[in-house]
C-alpha cells in the first residue's frame, strides 16, 4: 500500500509506503483549506492530489504492471457555488480534473462511474455514489478480464 501526499512547505510529492498508515491516509486526503495539514516527522502534509491527483505514475514506479484508475470527475454544468467552502471545493475539482486527464491516458483501464453530479463535499449521496461505482466496475470487467487473459497467456499470472 502506498499513499501520496503533498509536503505543504515545499510542494513536493511524498509517497508513504511504511510507517503509520493511518496518518499517511489522513495526510493523503487532507484537503487544503478544509482539513488541517497532518504532521509526520517534522513536516506537514496535505492531499496528494495537490501535485498528483491520480498517481498512475506512482503506481507504475512502485511496480504495478496493470493500473486501473477511477474517474470521479465532477460535472461543471451545475449551479454556481454559493458559499466559500463550495467555491474552494469547485476550484479544487477543476484543478483535479485538468491534472487527472493527463494521468488517465497512462492507465490500463479507467472506470467511469457517473458521479459528476455529486459534489465532493456532499456526503448525503454516498450510497448513490457507491452503487454507481459498483455499476461502473461491472461495466469495466470485460476490459479487466482481457488484461487478465493476456497476463495468463504471457505466463505472468497462474
Residue ranges of predicted features:
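Patatin-like phospholipase
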Residues: 1-158
Amino acid at each position: 500500500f502506498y499513499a501520496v501526499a503533498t509536503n505543504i512547505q515545499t510542494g513536493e510529492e511524498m509517497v508513504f509506503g511504511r510507517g503509520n498508515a493511518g496518518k499517511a491516509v489522513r495526510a493523503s486526503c487532507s484537503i487544503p483549506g478544509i482539513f488541517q495539514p497532518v504532521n509526520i516527522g517534522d513536516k506537514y502534509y496535505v492531499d496528494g492530489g495537490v501535485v498528483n491527483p491520480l498517481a498512475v505514475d506512482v503506481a507504475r514506479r512502485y511496480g504495478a504492471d496493470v493500473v486501473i484508475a477511477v474517474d470521479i470527475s465532477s460535472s461543471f454544468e451545475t449551479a454556481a457555488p454559493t458559499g466559500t467552502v463550495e467555491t474552494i471545493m469547485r476550484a479544487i475539482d477543476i484543478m483535479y480534473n485538468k491534472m487527472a486527464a493527463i494521468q488517465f491516458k497512462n492507465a490500463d483501464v479507467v472506470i467511469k462511474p457517473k458521479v459528476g453530479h455529486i459534489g465532493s463535499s456532499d456526503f448525503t449521496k454516498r450510497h448513490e455514489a457507491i452503487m454507481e461505482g459498483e455499476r461502473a466496475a461491472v461495466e469495466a470487467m470485460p476490459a479487466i478480464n482481457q488484461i487478465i487473459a493476456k497476463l495468463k497467456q504471457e505466463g505472468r499470472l497462474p
